Amino acid sequence: MFYLKINRDHEDDSGNSLPAGSWSVSLPGTTVYAKEIDFQVFVQRYQYLHYDAEVNEMVNKSVMAKNLYPQTEIPDMLGTFRCGSVPASQRDTLSADKALQQKEIKCFRMLFGKATFIDAVDETGKKVEDAVDVPILWRARGSNFMPISVPMDALTAQKKPFIFYKLRASLDKKKNGGLVYYVGKFDNAPKLVDFTPEDQDTLAYFMDYINGENTKVIKEYDDSLRKQGRMVDQEATTVTSDDVLNDDLPESLTG
């Protein structure tokens, strides 16, 4: 599995010119860039991360949950929920330090799937022909958190599991003062594709990854509660760990 990213740079450390505003993925021996990709989402999850940029350190992270409903408990490694994230509407009463800390806590849309890079090139501008069906994880946040939900929610509303469709994705250039950033733009006409035995294996890998990640976080959560002298509801945490995994997958894929 590789990480899908948005390249904002015009040049790399070696002085190579890069296509800013392109999708990118670092593969063994090379980094691939493309203005457009075909993206087939297999699994969608949500995870809170608390990252302290000053010390370049991950402070806390939550389990990967299947939704963000207010009633959904999303435990984290420090024995709290959602890394202590407080809704923006409720932050007026926070101290200055606590309010600043809230800016370090981000919610990510974790999108596991495969991507085919269209008219792909490497860092030297050479064409790359084999960046096809690359298993990827895209951690979308900020301005990129919502756009992909439009075609995915449309499929869900039609009772069409998004796992069986691919989306053509490009990037829109945006400006906020002197800041330039790029936002994913997704075709609203997803294409139905075959779900192959190889795809089933890739899905199993993704689910194992999510399960492993959640198991580690739940263990840290339980350990934190014990250190604080708080009761641990073992049954509740077990249900949380299991239920966030696969109850949104088509029955044909969960056996």
Per-range role (PLM):
Residues 107-192:
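Extended serine/threonine-enriched, polar tracts that run as long, contiguous segments within proteins
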Residues 153-255:
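Long, compositionally biased interface segments
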Residues 1-129, 176-177, 181, 240-255:
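OB-fold ssDNA-binding interfaces and closely related basic DNA-contact patches used
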